[in-house]
Amino acid sequence: SWNRLVSLELNVDNAWASYESDVMMKFQTLPDLHEIVKGFAKHEIAFFEQLFIARQAASGALVAKNVGDFNKAQSALAQLTPRFNALSEAYPEVKADSHFLDLSRRLVRIEERLADRREFYNSEVTIWNKAIQMIPTFIIAAVKGSQQRELIDVPDYYHQDYKIQF
């Protein structure tokens, strides 16, 4: 029914908003980490530029609710994360900095929440996509102009071992 489709669509939008909120928290934490590390690793400026270009692309796609572009930007950002962690390992004074430790822990908690929210969003999208393809709701979905939604990808990086190269 029409009401069921409206309800399902609102569930997808709500799940996206929850995910978006945590991604924005992550994006707000990254500049703080950047400021701490850049004081110790000034010769890594090119890396930090890559990190923030990827962050801006992901942020723009997130605000535009463009899941496809967000998936691409998030993948680029995820590939830079191990290098960021390696920088903290390479500079013991960074690793010992209490602000860095606090922010790193915060980032880990945010990443854990993001994984949960991504799973919830993808579940809601799957329910939505199934509903708009089934009889008789596909007729109502067509009248309503409903379209399939994209899932949030888990970047390939998370499924493989990563070797850090400088």
Residue ranges and their predicted role:
Residues S1-F166:
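A helix-centric hydrophobic-segment signal that preferentially recognizes long
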